[in-house]
Amino acid sequence: MLLGYGKVRTFVKLQIKMIMKKSIKRLPKRTQEELTVLLDLVRKSIGNCQMVILFGSYARGNYVLWDSNIEFGVHTSYQSDYDILVVVTGQIKYVERKLHRITNQYHDLFAGRRHAFPQFVVEHINTVNRNLEVSQYFFTDIVKEGVMLYNSGKHELAKPRKLS
């Protein structure tokens, strides 16, 4: 208990559970459509896909749909990309080649309109879990802020160890 301003205040230590979000409904409809197409392409092409997780600015909600500027007479533009972790069993190199083809298919499908670019990170489930068990920042951040777009249900993500 702490005393302050004449009142007794009790502070309770809360344990924050890392529960990954599972819905993209808060994102714009157009973004939902693009992510759904990407997810369908990934699931159809990669048989050993165990999980697909959106992370980064779109998962956090601080994405930029489109921004353009003219500075010193030069036109520049920016938009956030889709950061997507694809968790697999089996060979990663094989999956990376397929994701390159998927990216090209996706760009062909949305060629007539401005669309976000996907950036894929591919990791084996064992690598992801080993890194979570030692609380590696990149992976714990993905679990904390990410959105689970697909889960085969065959594997679970490890619980990050508490850092002291």
Predicted regions and their residues:
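Short, aliphatic-rich beta-strand segments
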Residues: 83-87
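Catalytic core of pol beta-like nucleotidyltransferases
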Residues: 2-53, 58-78, 88-164
